[in-house]
Design a protein with these regions (language model features):
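N-terminus-centric sequence/structural signature that marks the extreme N-terminus
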Residues: 1-104
Length: 104
C-alpha cells in the first residue's frame, strides 16, 4: 500500500515547510519503497510514496493534470481504468503514462 502525506496552510504568507513535508514523506518509506516525490505550492504540500503495481515505469505521483491546474495523489487500484482511459481519449484527453491514476 502506498503512503500519502499532505499539509495545507490557511494563512496566506505562511508557506508550507518543504523540509517538513519531505520528512513526513520519508517517514513512510516502508509504505512505498519504489519511489517517492512531493509537490510544494505556497499553501499546499503533498507527498507520495509509491508501491508500484500498474505501470511500473511511469506512474510517479503527485500527478499533475494536462492543464497544470490540478495536482493529485492517489492510493488504490482502478480496475476498469482501461475502459475509462479509452472513453477519455475519445473526448480528446492525452495521457502521459499507462497508470490507472491518470484517469482520475
Amino acid at each position: 500500500m502506498c503512503g500519502i502525506v499532505g499539509m495545507f496552510r490557511l494563512q496566506a504568507g505562511r508557506p508550507v515547510d518543504a523540509a517538513l513535508v519531505a520528512a513526513m514523506n520519508q517517514a513512510q518509506y516502508h509504505r512505498g519503497p519504489d519511489e517517492g516525490d512531493q509537490y510544494i505550492d505556497e499553501q499546499v504540500g503533498l507527498g507520495h510514496r509509491r508501491l508500484s503495481i500498474i505501470d511500473l515505469a511511469s506512474g510517479q505521483q503527485p500527478m499533475i493534470d494536462e492543464s497544470g491546474r490540478y495536482v493529485l495523489i492517489f492510493n488504490g487500484e482502478i480496475y476498469n481504468f482501461m475502459a475509462l482511459r479509452a472513453e477519455l481519449e475519445t473526448l480528446g484527453h492525452v495521457f502521459k503514462t499507462h497508470c490507472d491514476t491518470e484517469v482520475i
